Amino acid sequence: MSTGIEATWLGAADYAATYGAMKQFTLERLPETPDALWICEHAPVFTQGIAGRQDHILNPGAIPVVQTDRGGQVTFHGPGQVVAYPLIDLRRAGYFVKEYVYRIEESVLRTLAHFGVTGHRVAGAPGIYVRLDDPFSHAALTGPLPAGDPFRGLGKIAALGIKVSRHATYHGVALNVAMDLEPFSRINPCGYAGLQTVDLSTIGVQTTWEEAARVLSQKLGTYLAP
């Protein structure tokens, strides 16, 4: 199955410059413009979504905060995290935003499965989560989530935030591989106080950024296909 998506490996990329380039790409794209998939990692930066509240940024310190036009609230990007930006014409792809989000999440779930990890969706909280006590368990999340503590026993391993303009997507998804997780304690990740953030290394998966990026890129290419 092929999407015609051309993956571009940006390596270590400045966040503000990449954000500007995504917006420019989307602004200038024509009906025949090929879709793209940018893969990169960023220097430490907090990014705030359009729904973000200032009080969720607890103590940024010297880490810059960039206001963006993506959905969602505040998150952190840093070295050791694979960031993927699909630049897709949804009208040409033939599916709507809700399915687009589902397909991105499915790509992350399949990436985690490649490394033997079982990821989970949480209703109303985009992104992918793992069981802290047993990230390799294949058991589904069952029953209503605890009131006031919907993430009990879970850690967030991938964050998702998108923007759609004239049927075209930008922004994307970030998968934590082996990074300094301390900056996540300086914010309420995605607006949730106390939400624990993990990476593949924390849960016992030893892999390289390059390998995780390769697998995620492949899965996105497959699951974003029309």
UniProtKB/Swiss-Prot annotation:
Record's catalysed reaction(s): octanoyl-[ACP] + L-lysyl-[protein] = N(6)-octanoyl-L-lysyl-[protein] + holo-[ACP] + H(+)
Pfam families: LplA-B_cat
Domain of life of the source: Bacteria
One term under GO cellular component: cytoplasm
Job of this protein: Catalyzes the transfer of endogenously produced octanoic acid from octanoyl-acyl-carrier-protein onto the lipoyl domains of lipoate-dependent enzymes. Lipoyl-ACP can also act as a substrate although octanoyl-ACP is likely to be the physiological substrate.
UniProt-listed Enzyme Commission number(s): 2.3.1.181
Active site: 190
Classification via Gene3D superfamilies: Bira Bifunctional Protein, Domain 2
Identification of the protein by name: Octanoyltransferase
Site keyed Lowers pKa of active site Cys: positions: 156
Gene Ontology MF annotations: lipoyl(octanoyl) transferase activity
Key words, A-Z: Acyltransferase, Cytoplasm, Transferase
InterPro entries documented for this protein: aa-tRNA-synth_II/BPL/LPL, BPL_LPL_catalytic, Octanoyltransferase, Octanoyltransferase_CS
Binding sites annotated in the UniProt record for substrate: 70-77, 159-161, 172-174
Misc note: In the reaction, the free carboxyl group of octanoic acid is attached via an amide linkage to the epsilon-amino group of a specific lysine residue of lipoyl domains of lipoate-dependent enzymes.
Gene from which this protein is expressed: lipB
Localization (cell): Cytoplasm
Limits of the BPL/LPL catalytic domain: 31-226
Protein family according to the UniProt entry: Belongs to the LipB family.
Enzyme class: transferase
An individual GO BP term: protein modification process
